[in-house]
Amino acid sequence: LGNTPVMASVKQAEDRILRSQTTKSYVGPAGDVNYNETVARLLFGDQLLSSLGKRRITVQSPGGCGGLRLAAEFIRKANPDATVWVSDPTWANHTPLLGSAGLNIESYPYYDYSTHSIRFDEMIACLSKVSQGDLVLLHGCCHNPCGADLDHDQWDQIKDLALEKGFTVFIDLAYQGLGGGLEADVYGVRLL
């Protein structure tokens, strides 16, 4: 218990960094610029990234929890009255991470354990009542914990509803490349 093995590929990457590293100075508060640009290209693709111009920013965080906490702090400062809507079920850390930043948390129906399917009609009915300025947290792919992902048509319907109702979609994309592939797993991100 408490022993996380280090994979051979991680050891190889660490060796490569050790051989090529030229300084031990700190990186800036946003993280490593080259890393951030590579992540942005992987997430958005070259064409969308180019069209976004200066309307996006990439910040390196200490893991997924760190990124979610940074996002929660940003949301609270930008819109302290916003409610963040999370799926039922959602990853066990979503509610405490977002709630500890002082955000209001509500849930929307997502998964039916008896049929092993997404409760999409119920989800849309609930999200149609979300207030303008609220945020809806979606899992980009490999939904944690149920594994049931939205299809393209469902993503399209959510986009249309978000535009109509004025809520912001907030996507947790922890597993890009592990579902349908690197490109397929970012359909929702690139759509929205």
Where are the model-predicted features located?
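Conserved core of the PLP fold type I
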Residues: 22-168, 177-178, 183-190
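Conserved Walker B
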Residues: 173-174
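A short, surface-exposed helix-loop junction/capping segment
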Residues: 18-20
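A structural motif shared across PLP-dependent enzymes of the aminotransferase-like
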Residues: 1-16, 27-41
